[in-house]
């Protein structure tokens, strides 16, 4: 009488074990694909980032800070990078003289140069904060934060610089995003009255909720909610997940086709929530990236400016590739 039951139990156990092994095999394959994609991208980030420095001889908000952030993420995840070059250019990027072409250095000073490079400064800070101790280059990083605070607008916002105001979204949304990134680079510090006041004013500016139009707005707002310990982080996470496209990715603009920029941003934001909470969404996004990468390690990304007319551009491709690497490294 007991034999059929025993056979049934054995069959169930074998079936369960088979399914488990299959799931582990699929997961291992997915992880391998992610690793291959990251490894392929590292030389692209190094080569094209150094080419930009050689040609322009300066840092920019989208190029050098994201070279450093992407390579820091890859290094932290255990991938090989040129550590000597990374350290050299990380140090070089912290000096205000590096934020402009050397031809203009004699006509500028720190204050005037910082005014047009707030975006550069907060991305330089964010690209280091996850991967090194607070003591590393503490004085220089403190100076960058002081300069960011000094360039806050009267209404509490931080003005987007360079080409950012020309992006394909309302200027108000771009300004809110710039203010969110600035706040993320200025974590709360009770013994810094100037920073505390700047944060208060910036948060007041952000009280006006906009209808999310870009993955960057949703991701940056989610990251800020997490920094604040705000209960709205759960709602923001649901908004981000609901915007995921059928192919697993996100567009930089939510009503557009998936690209590496929006997808990398979304992955990074989800990794800060808890990457164990949303494995399906993360897995789908990873598969979108691993299946759409170019042979040279990049991901072609449509330009974010109106003048790009939706066509891939060198700067947006580099920016998006760096975000893809960051997102993949943080969720692998």
What are these regions (language model features)?
Residues 22-332:
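Preference for long, amphipathic alpha-helical scaffolds in soluble/luminal domains
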